[in-house]
A protein has these predicted regions:
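Flexible, glycine-rich beta-alpha linker
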Residues: 13-35, 58-59
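Sequence-level detector for tyrosine residue identity
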Residues: 3-4, 12, 21, 27, ...
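Active-site Tyr-X1-5-Lys
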Residues: 1-18, 34-47
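C-terminal substrate-binding subdomain of Rossmann-fold SDR/epimerase-dehydratase oxidoreductases
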Residues: 38, 44-184
Length: 187
């Protein structure tokens, strides 16, 4: 991108974002990232137990999808440099264990957490510094984690994901999954 920004009039922004979550996520235990898999584990839990791999200490920065879309809209409208790299995230790391506990609490389910210590615990903590996005574009994440979790749980329930046994609802037209780009649903 940087090379092409030097030889032509097109401007490029490389967005380095944290873990994105929200409605229309992939809620699949085998194929999704930590948020989607955790929601699926909690909502599909049997016997009143949710199992966490390792000790649950790994920590991730989670960013609600609408906040990322808002940044993309701002970058498209306000970018002045030919090329730039911008970090976009919540700026806060949450442990897998704390995420599991919050999803359980907000789901209203009565579940107990167990640990599978045969699985790895990788000492990892990531919190994205979004100060450049804030300074250059006036951007800050707007969605609190608990609010984003509630919106995601509602979408999951409304979409009937667990009952249908798939990651996302299919569009009624041509059997496609709805595409969402820059806040506009295209079906």
């Amino acid at each position: 991108c940087e090379f092409y920004s030097r030889i032509g009039p097109t401007q490029y922004t490389a967005i380095r974002h944290s873990n994105i979550y929200g409605p229309h996520d992939k809620y699949d235990l085998k194929k999704s990232h930590v948020f989607g898999a955790t929601v699926a584990k909690v909502l599909e839990a049997k016997n009143g137990v949710v199992t966490v791999w390792g000790d649950g200490s790994e920590a991730r920065d989670l960013l609600y999808v609408a906040d990322l879309v808002h940044f993309v809209d701002l970058a498209l409208a306000k970018q002045t440099a030919p090329f730039e790299v911008v970090n976009v995230g919540s700026g806060q790391a949450i442990s897998v264990l704390e995420l599991v506990r919050r999803i359980i609490a907000l789901s209203g389910k009565a579940l107990r957490v167990e640990f599978d210590r045969s699985k790895p615990s990788i000492p990892f903590k990531l919190a994205v510094d979004f100060s450049r996005a804030e300074k250059a574009y006036g951007w800050r994440p707007q969605t609190a984690l608990d609010e984003g979790i509630c919106k995601s749980l509602k979408w999951y329930a409304d979409a009937g994901v667990a009952e249908k046994g798939r990651a996302a609802p299919r569009s009624r037209r041509r059997g496609r999954t709805p595409q969402v780009r820059a806040g506009i649903s295209r079906e």
